């Protein structure tokens, strides 16, 4: 759970994890949500996959992640040997070079990537992968990422600082409601992608506004 007096420690024992989970659920029950660090509820993938098992559809490099949250395209390069970082369906992949490009993708297949792409996996069973994706695709997150990035010409996200990102985590039913609303709005934006540029821009701004509003919560009155 969030403790502003101490730096978070994400290398927790099972007993500490159970206690942390209990505190999150208690705060959700009392206040309607709990403020958490990203590292409280998610982790970076440590699993590996052989490069020979990958193809242009399942290998994801930073170059075939599309800017402005547009997902990914097929890779023009696939390593032939060695081992890659593994990702699974429901993981969130984020380009870690020049975070301001907002390269992010919710995996709909399993595959592999390299060290220039972060693979973020939920480590608790009461956060929806799609909800976590929407949290991490927000402008607020990318601003935070840039504020803590390293390097001038080619800034790189700071993996340790990223795990300290703070957001509000509501109960699972509220997550489902938010995801359903944002999915409908996302579909609407995609449906008009062939329209006039001004209309597309207006819809996109509306989507971003409502996404940010839906990810903010007021405490319940006790």
Placement of each model-derived feature along the sequence:
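Charged, alpha-helix-forming regions
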Residues: 1-222
